[in-house]
Amino acid sequence: MNDLQLQDELWRLVQGFKMTQAIYVVTRLGIPDLLKEGPRSHEELAQETHAHAPSLYRVLRLLTALGLFTEGEAHRFAVTPMGALLQTGVAGSMHNMVLRFGYTDFWQVWGALLYSVQTGQPSWEHVFGLSPWQYRAQNPEAAAVFDAFMAESIANLAPAIVAAYDFSTTSSLVDVGGGRGQLLASILQTYQTLHGVLFDLPHVVAEASPLLERAEVTERCQVIGGDAFKAVPADYETYLLSRVIHDWDDEHAVTLLTRCQQAMQPQGKVLLVEYMILTDRALEVPVLESDVNMLVAMGGKERTDAECCWPGPDALTAGPSTVLPD
């Protein structure tokens, strides 16, 4: 690239926060869903969303240039295939991801990235004076946004996990930190002889029943509330931790894995689903972005294979890994 091209590329990177907020605003207003039945004018959309029509038009025009919408005659807008991913109820929807990453708490925490870089501590508690869990317990709207994002991301990830690992010889599976059970339900639906245990904090699993009932797996799924740092359900064959370990520093990660190791049956195993920093291929921006996100939010991190081997009396060592498709 010449100097002008380099400047253009750097400009694009630095301006990214503006694009995020523009996408967030139209998603928060429900514009993509209003276009499910076909094109509509910005005046119609503004009237339905109680927005200022000229300002909404300017944002839609920007997002049209970014490839999320098309603009026809009389300023009538329609979604493109990429823009359709902002809609609810569609395959691969990223609606709740956008609402999460555009939400005010996420912006405040990333705005304090300098604090984390200078101190090595998560900026979340620096900004709010609370852990993420304490903050969401006191802010129901923020909790709802986060929970919807997690459910959506698990729904998008579950098919790849089910396809990547053969649970046919597994008799029992404990999903540690399994939330409301979306991933476990998907696994149980695929493997009809498998018995599962959903384990998470009591207030989290208290809301799992509707999803498990819709999946028709309640007869093969026990729901247990508790604190995994103290103990996990004992005497099961396999323990699954999906995107749990990356929340924590090495000390806490070892504690969680040790609890599972102590609880599992002889010859049992612990399965981890994590973003991995793969040292044998080009670095992948989404993984590295998630790594920095763990820094500011939780004090955790994404790890390489080698970093998943912790020294200690129980020799916590990573076994073979499987890379899920993009």
What are these language model-derived features?
Residues 66, 191, 316-317:
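Short glycine-rich hinge loops at helix-strand junctions in the catalytic core
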Residues 317-326:
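Conserved S-adenosyl-L-methionine
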Residues 91-283:
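Conserved adenosyl
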Residues 271-314:
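C-terminal alpha-helical "lid/dimerization" subdomain adjacent to the S-adenosyl-L-methionine
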